[in-house]
Amino acid sequence: MLFRSILIDASTNEIKLMANDMELGIETRVEGEIAERGVIALDAKIFSEIVRKLPDSDVTIETDASFKTVISCEKAKFNIVGKSGDDFSYLPYIEKNDAIVISQFTLKEVIRQTIFSIADNDNNKLMTGELFEINENELKVVSLDGHRISIRNIELKNNYENKKVVVPGKTLQEISKIVPGGVDDDVLIYLTDNHIVFEFDTTTVVSRLIEGEYFRIDQMLSSAYETKVIVNKKELLDCIDRATLLVKEGDKKPIIMNITDESMELKINSFIGSMNEDIDIEKEGKDILIGFNPKFFIDALRVIDEENVSLYMVNPKAPCFIKDDEGKFIYLILPVNFNNAAN
């Protein structure tokens, strides 16, 4: 659970639920009847688990002067201890100007298609977030972890002032969980020097940004290539997925691609066994023998919605690019040494 406490604020004519850890804050308004106004802070994990397992019916929450709380729904009744909301940190006031408008579906998809390649440790804080770069009517979202780069380019409905911010990965993961994802419903995004604000339906999310200048990746995005391969995405994904059956978690065994005219042979060797499989391809340019971390390829292929994908390679020590002709997405994956695994 991300938050320790949830504040239920029924001190006015509406019911608001809030959670805030000083880095990320969420506030949502819910419909209901207020019999007596008040505020209570409840343990976030316990409260959310109770609500999740209650019947799909109206919930009644009652508290007394000592913050003992009764949560009831149909025949179920829970008694838990709350606390005063006096020390609760409300969401900070953010001056909001020039909202960036994007559909809920698009935002959710962009996060899904990039979040897997952020770093999962804090050794480099910038790698734990994603770059949101506004350039007139385009939004570029970038994530990287030192071994791969994911880029999604989105065309916006309007032009905006150019701006770059780094949004924490945990913020985007939470957004992805709570945004309904409707195609016809929008999210309003506000950017300041220190915060990003997401507004959708009856919910507001405020997050601190990660400080620092994001990595300059343009020099890595060369369009030159020696080998281009067009392959059915599902066939390639399924083949690599099968190969990983022979790799224990934690093993660093590469998937080796031997690309020749009209055929890609994929093979893997591990202590468990070996596997090889041929896939039909369209090839342009030179033959190449190259190895990759199979998980990195699987992660990228799983979020691509195209029937066929294009792979661009230069040599066995240079990155592979998976990208479309329209420039909507680019996935860069660094190769690995496979000398010990090729036999």
List the model feature ranges, each with a label.
Residues 1-343:
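Structural preference for solvent-exposed beta-strand-turn elements
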